[in-house]
Amino acid sequence: MEFIMKTRMFEEEGWIRKKCKVCGKPFWTLDPDRETCGDPPCDEYQFIGKPGIPKKYTLDEMREKFLKFFEKHEVYPHGRVKRYPVLPRWRDDVLLVGASIMDFQPWVISGEADPPANPLVISQPSIRFTDIDNVGITGRHFTIFEMMAHHAFNYPGKPIYWIDETVELAFEFFTKELKMKPEDITFKENPWAGGGNAGPAFEVLYRGLEVATLVFMQYKKAPENAPEDQVVIIKGDRYVPMETKVVDTGYGLERLVWMSQGTPTAYDAVLGYVVEPLKRMAGVEKIDERILMENSRLAGMFDIEDMGDLKLLRKKVAEKVGISVEELEKAIRPYELIYAIADHTKALTFMLADGVIPSNVKAGYLARLLIRKSIRHLKELGLEVPLSEIVALHIKELHKTFPEFKEMEDVILEIIDLEEKKYSETLKRGSDLVRREIAKLKKKGMSEIPLEKLITFYESHGLTPELVKEIAEKEGIKVHVPDNFYSIVAKEAEKEKEEKEEEVVDFELVKDLPETRTLYYEDPFMKEFEARVLRVIGDWIVLDQTAFYPEGGGQPYDTGVLFVNGSEVKVTNVQKVGKVIVHKVENPGLFKEGMEVRGRIDWDRRIQHMRHHTGTHVLMGALVRVLGKHVWQAGSQLTTDWARLDISHYKRISDEELREIERLANRIVMEDRKVTWEWLPRTEAEQRYGFRLYQGGVVPGRVIRVVKIEDWDVQACGGTHLPSTGLVGPIKILRTERIQDGVERIIFACGEAAIKEWQKEREILKKASQVLRVPPEKLPETAERFFNEWKEARKEVEKLKKELAKLLVYELEAKVQKVKEYEFIGEIVEGSMDDLREAVERLKKPNRIVVLVSKEGYFAISVGDNVNLNANDLAKKLTSIAGGGGGGRKDVAQGRIKDVSKAKEAIESIVKLL
């Protein structure tokens, strides 16, 4: 579908719609002589060395200029909104925020939540890995950038502004605020589609650089049964109109600063505070600025992402500046590495400050990718500076604008140092792994490591393709590393697996029923209730109201009984399907629609779930205070006997930290703080409490239930809770586990369950005291004494074993047989596998074969250097007669036979071989 986007401004001010003579796309211009759209490769950069904005701006100045312009606009004042975290806790379908509109998906766009302001203006740090392999090379690509944006949400019957006003606001900002020349600005028509939405759009171009995109989101992906008269085709996909029309703009902060400074690259304009120190540290020679300028200009002229190779760019730049490709490579490579390090470490600063913990999964994997890529670049530069020192430069520069960086500085730098140490250890282990894999490939007759194997080396073992290539080429194996290797692995990491939960009851069978009244929220202490049966579906029944809690949010379902016509029927499972709660019963045949029933929940089970659920919130508050603000809940589960809480944390929790966490949690219990809950509109809850609300994960709905422990913890939570912390009872941490890289699991118990655990421990201590015949307080020193005595006894046993081995060798030396030109010892002896191994090694001589078999069936074989036989083959001969298995090297083999009665026959078969 082609949108002809004639706006009010275009008509009134004499703009001309033309078709670009290079790409054929339509664009609007004030210049009657213009023939090209202004978008590379149709036009090259015209601002490098000649800034396109009269005043030079810093990042902070340009950001404030933009925000203030829209905030104070006379006709369309916008509400200024603070940046959102780059880790989007409010949604679970993406790993990182890659655009400002993602802050408001899905809840605001769908109409389920109100925007924080309407219209609004924001400058949102955004992270994208699609161009990671081009960062540092092209002069313009970043993994992290700020998308300045103004958004308007036009709900049905509540219009704010649309295409005309958006274009006018953009033009006003560029020409009146930034003093750009109107005749050099073009608006290129280019429909946009992404994330299931689409609409007409303008790319705003100035002197060869795209400085903004204005998207008018008004379509959503069409369902299969959509009426054909409503369907539009955009970029090959089917869409239907949305109820809410959204103005989705994006202005490149870094690009506008670059435009104002006209520096050779965008990195020089916005990352100088890291670039310059790195140049000094690396002792990089000053480069002819023409090289960087031409590199940026030419990189902008073609889509390097589609080339898959840098050779063409290098060749063109070298020709332009009159040097060889080799000279260009030598001059420009250190700069490219420095630019990439500066960008990657800035992205890391935002990611770690917002709670990303490096790991091998999800956003943690992407953080680790940046860390290891940066370390590799430092190594190539010959710099031995800790990566944390470079990250510290970002914190120092940016903390005034982003004060959270200073608050998190110690944690951020410690994480970086730990990751650098881990990577060093990985590289030491990795070399052997690569060589083993190369040996396997050679056996298969392969001469090159395939891409899939390179990806596995990186994803599973942290081995960069550059390191693999270095090792492989020494072994005579080729390695081709694609220029976009890191983009490939990042893309794979960003693919979220869609896990479809199996529905217990088909939604279609209950969608016409009214929402179930939730008595467990109205009175969490309600033990019995009356209700009416609305529907029977197989083993499941639907009631008009219920006190049975359905499974959800880490809290198991309630069980209990329903009384119907004098019968008591067990309720074995409770689930929620849409807004309807369904109960699984043992005898569904007793229930009929319209019947009145009485329910009774298993109170002992419920109250223990409530203790553990409220205890989870208490413990979470203690964890954040002891370990740091980077800690986020990564999962939880409750039972009646214990609960578990998974948290993001970059190292094991120490015993000292655990004691402090447990002490703090129990202090909050003893203080008997109030626990309250209320239903709040999503946007109001977020503005009041921040995104810490989503500790337990994404909570759907326009209105969300917020559970608050007085001055301690606030979470959006659908579980049942106690009215005060005192009712939780004692909290006992049972143990911690490292369930995956970057995630710690705390298993704990509350109330009666905690008391039972203490009683168990007391019983264990009592039994240990009885066995050792000492009081409990003497157990540690007694255990230590026994352990030391055991170690001494073990040493004596080892000495005796060695003496016995010497004796065995002495006896066996007397039993040497002469078989042709060889010496042969073949005996059935007493001893363990270790004894046999030591004996054959001691008996080994250049002209001798030794075969020893124990009465348990273990065997060991040694073959001297001058013997033309293979120990591995002899092991196979032995097991071919007596069964079992074994193997080894040419000179030594071991194993175990199945039939010891055939040991003598098997040994004699080896004599015959000689």
UniProtKB/Swiss-Prot annotation:
GO biological process annotations for this chain's record? alanyl-tRNA aminoacylation
Query: Is Nucleotide-binding one of the keywords?
Result: yes
Q: Which gene encodes it?
A: alaS
EC class, as a word, reads ligase
Q: Which HAMAP family match?
A: Ala_tRNA_synth_A
**Protein name in the entry:** Alanine--tRNA ligase
Q: Which SMART domains match?
A: tRNA_SAD
Q: Does the keyword Metal-binding apply?
A: yes
Q: Which cofactor does it need?
A: Zn(2+)
The residue stretches assigned to a coiled coil in this entry are none
CDD domains in the record, alphabetically? AlaRS_core
Q: Would you tell me the Gene Ontology cellular component terms?
A: cytoplasm
Binding residues for Zn(2+): H613, H617, C717, H721
Per UniProt, which keywords does this protein have?
Aminoacyl-tRNA synthetase, ATP-binding, Cytoplasm, Ligase, Metal-binding, Nucleotide-binding, Protein biosynthesis, RNA-binding, tRNA-binding, Zinc
Species: Pyrococcus abyssi (strain GE5 / Orsay)
What does the record say about domains? Consists of three domains; the N-terminal catalytic domain, the editing domain and the C-terminal C-Ala domain. The editing domain removes incorrectly charged amino acids, while the C-Ala domain, along with tRNA(Ala), serves as a bridge to cooperatively bring together the editing and aminoacylation centers thus stimulating deacylation of misacylated tRNAs.
The similarity annotation says: Belongs to the class-II aminoacyl-tRNA synthetase family.
Q: How is the cofactor bound?
A: Binds 1 zinc ion per subunit.
Compartments annotated for it: namely: Cytoplasm
